[in-house]
Amino acid sequence: MNLEARSKQFLAAPIAIFVSCSLFLIPAKSQEKPRLKVVELDTHGKDYLQVLAGPPESVTMKSGLEVLAPNQSVGKHSTGQHEELLVVLEGRGVMTFDDGSKLDVKANHALYCPPETEHNVTNTGSNVLRYVYVVASTK
């Protein structure tokens, strides 16, 4: 078999595999369209309120309202394969990262965390810290 014939044979296999695999991906796109939703941001004395729970309420977004008492922290966690946005409604605190860096958290500020970022939010003020977080999948 000459070089040109072997090249064509070699290229045919990956193309056939790609076509075959792409057929399995088609049904995953049949998710029902999410509906409009309004959520009152009142925790009724609780420290957490789920705003969006992910599919089928949204395409990839999850969201919640956190309320931290003075000196309370949400706990160290990673964004994983998600982006995260925090919108601070009330209070002040600090967001700490594994590398030792810190960001001030205060009312009327929004903070963005990229994927694969370990962080923690702690209330450093004398009143409650209230913020809404929104996470969206990057995959």
Predicted regions and their residues:
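Bacterial N-terminal signal peptides that target proteins for export
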Residues: 2-15
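A short, N-terminal "cap"/entry segment at the start of jelly-roll beta-barrel domains
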Residues: 18-62, 70, 75-76, 96, ...
